[in-house]
Amino acid sequence: MSGISLGIPDGPPPVLAPRRKTRQLMVGGVGVGSDHPISVQSMTTTKTHDVNATLQQIAQLTASGCDIVRVACPKTVDAEALPAIAAKSPIPVIADIHFQPKYIFSAIDAGCAAVRVNPGNIKEFDGRVKEVAKAAGDAGIPIRIGVNAGSLDKRIMEKYGKATPEALVESALWEASLFEEHGYGDIAISVKHNDPVVMVEAYRQLAAQSDYPLHLGVTEAGPAFQGTIKSSVAFGALLAEGIGDTIRVSLSADPVEEIKVGDQILQSLNLRPRKLEIVSCPSCGRAQVDVYKLADEVTAGLEGMEFPLRVAVMGCVVNGPGEARDADLGVASGNGKGQIFVKGEVIKTVPEDQIVETLIEEAMRIAEEEGLEAVEGQKAEVRVTK
């Protein structure tokens, strides 16, 4: 009997598409492109000319896992501060340039690892591309062409009427072509919009038409909650399709929060090694413990742990034991006490007021025992940063 195809695939499709192949760039010591891990960026909120404050915030971002940092350069005093910042920053510094093309050259001379230019608002930018290309090429640094919906070139707006995906892409590729004409191709591109739907379509079109590394971002995303949702939806859609090489979550919040969200997005898609993961139930009428408080206290106690640990915090006996057994460490709470599970086995039962302390102690013990042997026979340090 001949085989009949029912159109059923041999196996499940991959959850994520392969990374889109791009050209490779180096932003300082951080590779950007399909041959490198997806990096997480942020931008300082200090006045750049306040060198000490800016470096202090960069240090905080670095400690939070930031790979690349961008600083604004709106004034001459800011440009004058760039050499000190670029020299002392522990991570690569990108100068963000708007309006004044002269600051592009200042940033290059200052030793910045890259420059972001907004062609929509830099005076006579097209006429200065040859000079910029030569300066960046001589310095061996890349340039990001950062197109924003709110500052599109007038010519593009006259053609399209508004910031459509096609308008964003045309603007970016036009500027890139000018650099290419002068033999410069170390280019990354972003096409940001505050509407995730428009933004996603713009990046899809851009990915189909070029091999430039893409910096993902939703511009003016909003306060922490709203911005987190917008960026997560947009980045998740694109990254699942293999599109995106570096990301910046824009939030009206402490920039450290941008790093936390970006890092979690990548971890959730298995695009970055998972670290601490707290699994907790949403609570309901069956809960016999304050799950919200318990989960928050455990999260706070283990914040910064550099170890892939899954901790389950459950509030009743319905899903609690099952979830706790599937985790590296967990608690199933009820009747004023908690059963502590390690690798699926109950190791002890403790009073409710000792649950948090016990979970933290057990987490540290597991981390020390399971994979923190950096050198055989030598105990490695458990890192929990605050």
From Swiss-Prot:
Converts 2C-methyl-D-erythritol 2,4-cyclodiphosphate (ME-2,4cPP) into 1-hydroxy-2-methyl-2-(E)-butenyl 4-diphosphate. It is an enzyme of class 1 (oxidoreductase). Its EC number is 1.17.7.3. Its cofactor is [4Fe-4S] cluster. Binds 1 [4Fe-4S] cluster. InterPro entries: Dihydropteroate_synth-like_sf, IspG_bac, IspG_bac-typ, NO2/SO3_Rdtase_4Fe4S_sf. [4Fe-4S] cluster binds at C281, C284, C316, E323. The gene is ispG. Pathway: Isoprenoid biosynthesis; isopentenyl diphosphate biosynthesis via DXP pathway; isopentenyl diphosphate from 1-deoxy-D-xylulose 5-phosphate: step 5/6. It catalyses: (2E)-4-hydroxy-3-methylbut-2-enyl diphosphate + oxidized [flavodoxin] + H2O + 2 H(+) = 2-C-methyl-D-erythritol 2,4-cyclic diphosphate + reduced [flavodoxin]. Disulfide bonds: none annotated. This is 4-hydroxy-3-methylbut-2-en-1-yl diphosphate synthase (flavodoxin). Keywords: 4Fe-4S, Iron, Iron-sulfur, Isoprene biosynthesis, Metal-binding, Oxidoreductase. It comes from Corynebacterium jeikeium (strain K411). GO terms for molecular function: 4 iron, 4 sulfur cluster binding; 4-hydroxy-3-methylbut-2-en-1-yl diphosphate synthase activity (ferredoxin); 4-hydroxy-3-methylbut-2-enyl-diphosphate synthase activity (flavodoxin); iron ion binding.
